[in-house]
Each structure stands twice: as C-alpha cells, then as structure tokens.
C-alpha cells in the first residue's frame, strides 16, 4: 500500500511537521525544559515526579536519501525563483551598478577557496575585504589618538581585573566612564586641543543619601526623588553598568551599583557643572587640583542585590524602569510622568529569573491595543524571557509572552525592527555565504514552505518577497575561522570552508592528506603557497543540494532520534512523496491573486504518524543518576526556596518613611507561576501537553538498577547544591538544547496561528497579529542569534564561536582568557545598520544587519583586536599579552617590562575592554561630508576610536 501524504484537510502546523525531519512522540522525564512545564513548576527543571509529555518534538536527522525534493517540486520552485529574477531584471539590467555587482558575485564564486578569510593567499581576516563590493561594505579606519585620557583609571586600584558590563557611554562630545565608585567625565573637544590631562576630566562621585538607617535595610527597595535633600557622602560602590536613557523629554545617565543601587542623573545638569569646572581651571580661576564635581542625582533606586542592567521607557504618562539584578530577577518601578500632579505610589513588580540577569530592555513602540508594553530580559541560566506590562490602579499588571532556552549563558538582548536592516539585492550579500549549495538549499526550502502553507502571491510583479517560510528556516551565518591563524596548526584534520567552496559542486569541506602532519600543514598555510596548500587537501564529497536543515541547537552533543526500521522507512517515503502536494495556490478559498493557470492542489489521502507517536522513550535515563532519583518535598521547597516564594509580600502598599523615601519589602522573590498564571497541576491536566505518573519514584523502570539508588544524605546534599544558582548553571546545558528545539517547534505552531487571516496571499505579504516588525539580537558567551520577537523563533545564528581561543598559543593564563572571552558588549549603530559586538578579552566584530526579499539576517564584516604574530620569526612589533590581564611585570630598572615572550602567536591590543559606544555625524552638504560613525573603545586605561562609514554615506531607510 503506497504511503499516505499530507492533504488539504491537515492544519498548517501538521503539514509543516510532515514536511520536516521532526517527530512527535511521548517521553517520560524528571528534567523538563518545556516552556509551560518549566514556568508552572516555579522555574525548576527538576520535578518531584516523572512527567510524561505526550507531544515531545525532536529532530530526526534524515540520511542522504531523505535530502531530495520531488522533481515536480523542483520545477515549481525554479519557476518561482525565475519569476522573481525576471521581476528584478526589468529595471536592474539598464543599471551599470547592477551589472557590476552581478559580475563581482560571479568572479567571487569562480575564485573558490582563494577568497576564504585566512585560508586564501592574502590571509586577510575580514570578510568585507574579500567578499563585498566597495559600495556594499562598511569602511573602517582607526583614528589615531595622541592622548591617553583615562590615565586616572587604574583597574588594579579597584581590586584588580574585574568582570563588568558596559562602563563607558558617550553623549555628543562628552563621555562618561565608570571608575570604581566614581564616574569619570570627559569632553572630547577639550581632549583634542589641550595637552594637560589634569584639567581634561572630572570625577562624579557616586553618593547615597544619608537618611536614617538606609544601610540597614538590606531586604528592601527604595526610591528617592530629587525633591529630597541629598548629602554628598561618597560610598564605596563598584559600578557594574552605565547607560543613557531618555524620558520626561530629557536625557539621563543611569549607573547600576554592586550594592544594588541605581543612580539617575540629569545629563544636562552634569554637563553644566562640568563645563563650569573646566572653564574655571582653563581660565586660571581655580588652581586647586580637586577634580571632584558633586551633582545630586535626580533619582535613586535600590534593589536587594547587586544590579547589572537597567532600561527605561516613557509611555502612557507612566515611566517604567526595569532593573536586572542578582537576586536573581528583574524589578520594575513605575512613576507618574507628570511631576506637577500629586505623585501616586505605584507598587513595584518583581519578575523571576533562574539566574542572574545581565541585560534587560523594553521593546520600543510595543504598546498593544489594550495598553501593554513588552519587556525582554536574558539570564545566565540560558534563557530569554518576554513579558507584557501595564500599570493599572497603582499596580503593574503582567501578561507572560514567551521564554526560550539556549543551553548557553546569555549576556545581551537588543530589540530591533525591520527598519534596522539594510536591503541587499543578492542572496550572497545576506550573510556572505557564496556556496551555491547553501543558496539553493535555503531558497528551495523557503519556497517549499510558502507553497505548502499557502503564503505567497502568484503574481511576482505584485510581491517581490518570500512568504512566511523566511521565518521557518534557520540561516547559519558564517564567521571567520580564526583558528587557522594558530602557529600550532589547525585544531583538526577537517577544513570547513565557511564562506566559499573548493569547487562549484557544492563541496564545503576538505581534509588534510595523510602524509601531512598538523604542524607541516600550518607551515604551508602560513607560508602563503596556495598551490602547495591546495595540493595538501583532499576534497570531500559534495553536500546535498536540498533540505540541508540546520538548527541552532544542533551540535556534536545533540542526540537525534533513531526510529525503527519500519518507522524510518515510512518516514523516508513521506519525505520523498510529499512534494507532489506542492502546487501553487494551496488554499481552499479562492484568491484574488490566484495564478491564471488555475493549478490547484491535488487530492492526497491522509497520513498519521501513529507508529512514531507510540514510540515512547524515557529520556530521564540520559541524565545524572542523582538527578533521576532526586526526591523533593514540595512543601519544604515552598518554605525555603526563593523560586517558590509568594509575591504577596512584594505587592503590599509601601510605607512612606522620613525623607520622602519609598520603601518596599522585597524579601520574597518573584514566582514564575504567578507570572505565568498556571501551576503545575493545571498544566498536567492539559491532555495536549502531558500527564503525571503517580508514585513515579517507585516505578520499576526507574529504580530497577540498584546502582542508581542514592542515600538520603546524598540526595539532601545534591538538593542543597542544586538550589545554588551557580550549580544550576552547570546543570542547565545537559538537556537545554534538545528542549530548546522542542519549544522552537511549539512556537512554529504559535507563529502560524498568529498570522492575520487573509494576509497569506496578499501582495503586501503576510501579517502577524502582534509585533510583526520586531526582532531580537542576542549574544551568548560565544555565539550570535537573531530571533523573531513573538513568538521567540531563531531565524539566523552563528554556529561556530566568533572568537575561538582553542588554537591560540599564549603565555597568559588560558582559563583567564576564556573567562574574559564572553560577548557581553553590544553597540547598535542604527544609522549604518551595524552592530558591534565585543568581549572583555579585547576582541570586536562589526556586523551588518541585512534583508533580502523578506529574509532577515546579518553578516560579519570586520574583526578588530586580533593581531597575528609569528613566534618563530618575531618582528619588533610583537607584543606579549601578560601585561594586559595580569599585574604589570617590571624589569630590574623598575620600568614596566614590555619584552616579547616569544610564545604569544596572537596579541590583543585592546585587552580588558570595559565599554564601547559611538557618536554619529550626519551628512553635511555644506561641509561636503558623508555621514559617519565613530566607535569608541575604552580598555585598560586607554581609548581607541574607529571611523565607520559607507561609500554612499548614511544608509537610506
């Protein structure tokens, strides 16, 4: 009997599932990162009982026989792509720039691996210098600065090397740098024209109000307004983060302290006092060497624990301030915008987190039809959270949106809109992947999804974009393989070309021939002899042309599902026969944009994955035995664990103390269940999600192995360790990746359900009912991710580490370098559609946000701060990394030693970055100047500046 295939009666999600290598089955486990179960259990991924999910989604990676489209499908897709090209060529062919760009793309592909960054004969690191035409790439030039403005800042004077978030911001010609318990204020204009450093900057001390027993209220939050008298008492408080926000029609400087206090200054007031200070000194009116200026804060906020992030939004007459801290969680304060009215005391809100919150951001222009705004934050636990907020009757109401898990520390989240992306005319310019196999695979898969789900317009002259398939296919963004610069040789035998190919037959990898050692190959690579290098490579077989599905969660540690031979055979038949369904206009309703040919979907029979649904696996066996046998007393959790405490004591009416302080008792932590609105029992009763196996700890299939049994004391010890957030961080990656994929599939269903009815075949493209234009750009410790904002769906990501250190040879501590090498600095240069990402180690990558026919992605253009050295034949410019990250070493004469160690094959000149920000100079016809940005990088007591522009100036939105 021939296999059955999807038909018109299937809902869109079922069609999509059947077209993918994804299975739906039941699993039994104690560790669960299903988003709903996780929230309903109070933010614990370990449950008391074994939970059985009836619909657990897992990737079934097909073999080569599954990676092909039906010839009929290929015919339809080729016709669609041809029509789009014809649509473009009608106006692009007469354009000389278009012809030049087309020739450039063809020449680049014909060069094969010669233009691969690092690998090619030029050995250049930057993809933009090799793979982009002049009018498409950013132009970067370092501006030499003849001064070291941050001489006062000695990082070792404040406890040595410190791990902080961004400590440097710019405001016009002014800059602010956190220096211990002070904020260093500078004027760039004066710095460029005055030689004396002593009169170029001032220090703004961090102060706290000396009002009653402020320091004794450790379990309290407070707010103090500017109408209260402040006493300027310097307080030793290490600043963790600084930011500039606009609200109440003016700009403010915000600083987060290690003591849980957020200071908010009016920038204009700070600048006014600073200018008077510098004017008096420059004019000779003040000969004192006192560099302190005292500016009373406009507002002071306090949370219980150390705070590391803050953001503000001003909307609906209410100011919302969100503070991310190490309680862990997010505290949201709210105030009336109109200070002339009698101030209402709006109760603050605590939002939960399973680990520290290094970044929090409101989504601009996210107000919905009922007045809710959207807040986003990420956690070291490995997840991102979005939640809606609205002030009502002196209370902040919440509506939970989504959470997603990544299996890696998350450090930043940046809201974006479609206007932040630069349009490109060619697919290759989307993320600089010139491999024809990748292009064909992704475009075919997108077209297949559009046809299958009915999200396309038949008339190519009305719609130049692809449909919703652009959100259902994850783009792998290539980054330069910096490991190839290592003097010790490449880290393995496989040579994965990331941007180019060895030939035009879709080959993407090669391997070193057996007669060459890694060291021999390194000599060939660094000698620049291209012929010898290619002769040393064995080209691997071609990759498949279609359906090369890649996901963010796929790596060597991910265990794909292995179906039975019977199940796999049936699954393979579905993949091979399914494309017969794909003919244009796959909708039951009549479309006004339907192709005149009148082709419609055929009438296939129904198929159900019953065999795969009945294949149940207890994945709890994959986890640590102590985790599997963990027995928790839920009542004891409620009494002792922060994550399970009630919000009732948080939301009481505040007590108004002397000095106009607003005190809030925040002894109780926020609870995921309160935010989500459901408890675990409610979720377990949902037959679509899961069921509960009672007395599960006594089931034979769990405890049948006597070696799995643990003593009561061991369980108690494990439970105690597990409750510590640091221990939870080590446990999170065990299964977060597979559960992240499961949640991704569930969010695809939400995405399809959120489409506005009737927009599928509109010439204007599909429309989502909520947050249609919004995205998030996230950084993990080593990777970059672009997500749709709602639901949280990854659409582009880097698969490899952007700053890999595994091949680096250095005399400095490798473990220290790894700890510093987290991507926790992000600077969004909107005017140039550019994002700069950096690690404290001193490495920066300039990225470009791009869009092609409704596909939103990004590309890597430049790498800054990675200087390759040759320890065998060192040049006079070679430097050692030890003085950047360790205490300075001194020679016999007492001078700082800068002697090259003869070991470091990479030097990090911007080591120990403490912050980055930019200024922008607009186009000026009068000055005959194109718009440009200046990226400032503060590191190790020095300042570097990079001029960034494009050949045509500001990108037109």
Swiss-Prot record:
Residues 695-719 are annotated as: Disordered. Keywords: Phosphoprotein, Transcription, Transcription regulation. Induction: By DNA damage and hydroxyurea (HU). Residues 697-710 have a biased composition (Acidic residues). The modification Phosphoserine is found at residue 704. The keyword Zinc does not apply. It comes from the Eukaryota. Present with 125 molecules/cell in log phase SD medium. Substrate targeting component of a cullin-RING-based E3 ubiquitin-protein ligase complex RTT101(MMS1-CRT10). RTT101(MMS1-CRT10) may regulate nucleotide synthesis through transcriptional regulation of RNR genes encoding ribonucleotide reductases. This is Protein CRT10. The gene is CRT10.
């Amino acid at each position: 009997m021939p296999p059955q295939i999807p038909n018109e009666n299937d809902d869109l999600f079922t069609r999509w599932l059947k077209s993918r290598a994804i299975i739906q089955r039941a699993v039994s486990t104690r560790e669960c990162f299903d988003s709903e179960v996780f929230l309903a259990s109070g933010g614990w991924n370990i449950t008391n009982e074994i939970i059985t999910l009836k619909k657990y989604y897992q990737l079934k990676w097909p073999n080569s026989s599954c990676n092909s489209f039906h010839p009929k499908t290929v015919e339809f897709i080729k016709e669609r792509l041809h029509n789009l090209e014809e649509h473009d060529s009608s106006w692009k062919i007469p354009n000389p720039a278009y012809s030049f760009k087309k020739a450039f793309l063809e020449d680049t592909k014909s060069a094969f691996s010669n233009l691969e960054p690092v690998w090619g004969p030029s050995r250049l690191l930057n993809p933009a210098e090799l793979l982009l035409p002049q009018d498409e790439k950013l132009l970067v030039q370092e501006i030499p600065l003849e001064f070291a403005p941050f001489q006062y800042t000695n990082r070792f004077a404040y406890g040595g090397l410190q791990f902080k978030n961004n400590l440097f911001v710019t405001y016009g010609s002014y800059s602010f740098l956190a220096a211990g318990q002070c904020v260093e204020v500078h004027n760039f204009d004066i710095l460029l024209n005055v030689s004396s450093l002593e009169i170029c900057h001032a220090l703004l001390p961090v102060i706290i109000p000396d009002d009653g027993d402020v320091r004794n209220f450790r379990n309290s939050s407070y707010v103090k307004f500017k109408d209260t008298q402040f006493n300027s008492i310097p307080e030793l408080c290490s600043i963790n983060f600084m930011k500039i926000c606009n609200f109440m029609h003016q700009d403010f400087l915000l600083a987060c302290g290690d003591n849980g206090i957020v200071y908010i200054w009016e920038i204009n007031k700070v600048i006014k006092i600073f200018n008077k200070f510098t004017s008096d000194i420059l004019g000779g009116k003040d000969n004192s060497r006192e560099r302190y200026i005292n500016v009373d804060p406009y507002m002071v906020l306090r949370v219980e624990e150390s705070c590391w992030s803050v953001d503000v939004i001003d909307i609906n007459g209410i100011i919302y301030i969100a503070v991310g801290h190490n309680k862990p969680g997010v505290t949201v304060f709210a105030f009336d915008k109109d200070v002339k009215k009698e101030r209402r005391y709006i109760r603050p809100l605590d939002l939960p987190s399973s680990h520290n919150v290094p970044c929090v951001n409101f989504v601009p222009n996210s107000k919905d039809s009922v007045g809710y705004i959207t807040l986003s934050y990420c956690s070291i636990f490995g997840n991102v959270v979005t939640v809606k907020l609205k002030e009502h009757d002196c209370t902040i109401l919440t509506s939970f949106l989504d959470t997603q898990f990544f299996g890696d520390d998350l450090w930043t989240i940046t809201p974006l809109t479609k206007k932040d992306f630069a349009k490109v005319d060619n697919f290759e310019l989307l993320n600089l992947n010139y491999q024809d196999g990748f292009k064909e695979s992704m475009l075919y898969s997108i077209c297949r999804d559009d046809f299958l789900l009915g999200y396309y317009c038949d008339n190519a002259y009305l719609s130049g974009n692809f449909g919703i398939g652009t959100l259902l296919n994850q783009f792998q963004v290539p980054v330069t393989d910096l490991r190839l610069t290592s003097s010790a040789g490449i880290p393995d035998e496989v040579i994965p070309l990331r941007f180019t190919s060895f030939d035009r037959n879709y080959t993407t990898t090669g391997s070193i021939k057996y007669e060459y050692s890694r060291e021999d190959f390194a000599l060939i690579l660094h000698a620049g002899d291209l012929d010898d290098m290619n002769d040393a490579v064995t080209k691997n077989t071609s990759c498949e042309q279609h359906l090369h599905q890649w996901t963010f969660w796929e790596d060597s540690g991910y265990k794909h599902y292995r179906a039975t031979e019977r199940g796999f055979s049936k699954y393979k038949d579905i993949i091979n026969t399914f494309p017969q369904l794909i003919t244009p206009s796959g909708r039951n309703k009549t479309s006004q944009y339907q192709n005149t040919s009148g082709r419609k979907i055929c009438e296939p029979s129904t198929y159900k994955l019953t065999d795969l649904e009945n294949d149940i696996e207890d994945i709890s066996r994959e986890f640590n035995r102590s985790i599997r046998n963990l027995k928790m007393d839920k009542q004891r959790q409620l009494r002792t664990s922060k994550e399970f405490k009630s919000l009732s004591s948080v939301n009481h009416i505040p007590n108004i103390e002397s000095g106009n302080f607003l005190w809030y008792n925040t002894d109780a932590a926020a609870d995921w269940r309160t935010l989500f609105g459901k408890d675990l029992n409610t979720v377990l009763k949902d037959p679509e999600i899961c069921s509960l196996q009672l007395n599960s700890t006594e089931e034979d299939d769990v405890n049948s192995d006597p070696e799995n049994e643990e003593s009561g004391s061991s369980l108690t010890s494990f439970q105690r360790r597990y409750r510590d957030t640091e221990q939870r961080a080590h446990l999170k990656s065990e299964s977060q990746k597979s559960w992240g994929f499961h949640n991704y599939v569930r969010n695809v269903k939400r995405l399809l359900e959120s489409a506005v009815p009737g927009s599928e075949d509109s010439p204007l493209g599909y429309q989502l009912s909520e947050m249609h234009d919004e995205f998030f750009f996230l950084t993990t410790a080593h990777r970059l991710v672009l997500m749709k904002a709602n639901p949280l769906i990854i659409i582009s990501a880097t698969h490899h580490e952007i700053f890999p250190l595994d091949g680096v040879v250095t005399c400095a501590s490798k473990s220290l370098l790894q700890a510093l090498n987290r991507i926790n600095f992000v600077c969004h240069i909107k005017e140039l559609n550019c994002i700069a990402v950096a690690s404290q180690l001193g490495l920066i990558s300039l990225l470009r946000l791009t869009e092609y026919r409704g596909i939103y992605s990004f590309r890597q253009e430049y790498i800054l701060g990675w200087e390759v050295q040759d320890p065998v034949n060192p040049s006079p410019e070679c430097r050692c990394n030890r003085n950047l990250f360790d205490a300075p070493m001194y020679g016999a004469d007492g001078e700082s030693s800068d002697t090259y160690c003869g070991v470091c094959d990479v030097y990090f000149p911007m080591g120990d970055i403490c912050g980055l920000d930019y200024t922008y100079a607009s186009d000026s016809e009068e000055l005959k100047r194109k718009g440009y940005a200046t990226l400032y990088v503060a590191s190790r007591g020095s300042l570097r500046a990079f001029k960034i522009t494009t050949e045509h100036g500001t990108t037109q939105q």
